[in-house]
Regions:
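Buried hydrophobic positions in well-ordered alpha/beta secondary-structure cores of metabolic enzymes
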Residues: 4-7, 27, 44, 90, ...
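PLP-dependent enzyme catalytic core of the Aspartate aminotransferase-like
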Residues: 170-185
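Structural signature of PLP-dependent enzymes
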Residues: 73-117, 128, 132
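Conserved PLP-binding catalytic core of the aspartate aminotransferase-like
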Residues: 109, 113, 124-167, 172-173
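The feature captures the short pre-catalytic strand/loop hairpin that immediately precedes
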Residues: 61-79
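Catalytic PLP-binding core of fold-type I/II PLP enzymes
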Residues: 1-26
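Active-site PLP attachment segment
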Residues: 22-66
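Glycine-enriched alpha-helix->loop->beta-strand junction motifs that scaffold or abut catalytic
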Residues: 22-26, 153-156, 177-179
């Protein structure tokens, strides 16, 4: 099996996840974004037949007598004491996010659409996002994205300026030196 990891950081909790349909063998997602869990949590879906090497050995609750991790998932990756409060918080957040996913997606799409339309009317503003996206990226000509983000923050509008952990995308867009302003309603 050829390993194929999909990063669902901006997708999980907002759109249905279909890793088998997508042909991926692993799907990683943070808990604190669309899944509404606590910071420091996350999930890794691993397809049947894929075995990952553990980062640490020993201290597993399922084979305490062994110095090595069991060769079964998920036990193979779970050494030490699990973050049970974090897991419970992630579970509660996931339940809420998934129960309201359609409603949230419709509201987010409407907000993004209104903002995109308004930004496209402004002189000197370049919008990088497709019309059907659930987040929005833009720049104001001649003003660094971080400066725009700070100015909006002063008005009580929370956005993020910069490269958003995606230098390849910014290289493609020609914004590697300035980044972009990202709005995630």
């Amino acid at each position: 099996v050829f390993p194929f990891l999909v990063d669902a950081a901006q997708t999980a909790g907002h759109l249905p996840l279909e890793p088998k349909k997508w042909g991926c063998t692993m799907l990683a997602m943070p808990g604190h974004k669309g899944l509404l869990g606590p910071h420091g949590t996350g999930a890794l879906w691993v397809a049947d037949g894929v075995m990952l090497a553990p980062l640490r050995q020993g201290g597993t609750g399922s084979a305490s007598e062994s110095m090595f991790q069991p060769r079964i998932m998920p036990d193979s990756l779970e050494s030490g004491t699990l973050n049970l409060p974090g897991i419970a918080g992630l579970y509660a957040g996931m339940r809420f996010a998934l129960a309201h996913q359609q409603e949230a997606r419709e509201t987010t799409a409407a907000l993004c659409g209104m903002m995109r339309d308004a930004l496209l009317e402004m002189a000197g503003v370049r919008v990088y996002t497709r019309a059907d996206a659930l987040l929005l990226s833009f720049n104001v000509a001649g003003i660094a994205s971080q400066v725009v983000a700070s100015a909006l923050d002063e008005q009580g509008i929370a956005v993020r300026g910069g490269l958003h952990c995606a230098p390849g995308v910014h290289r493609f867009l020609g914004t590697l030196n300035i980044g972009a302003v990202r709005v995630s309603p």
